[in-house]
């Protein structure tokens, strides 16, 4: 996924 400064599921990175 993309490198964003938004927490996705808990990880503050584009790691879904």
From Swiss-Prot:
MF (Gene Ontology): glutamate dehydrogenase (NAD+) activity
Reaction equations catalysed: L-glutamate + NAD(+) + H2O = 2-oxoglutarate + NH4(+) + NADH + H(+)
Enzyme class: oxidoreductase
EC numbers, comma separated: 1.4.1.2
Keywords: NAD, Oxidoreductase
The keyword Oxidoreductase belongs to this UniProt entry's keyword annotation: yes
Active site: 12
Family statement: Belongs to the Glu/Leu/Phe/Val dehydrogenases family.
Protein known as: NAD-specific glutamate dehydrogenase
Species: Thunnus thynnus
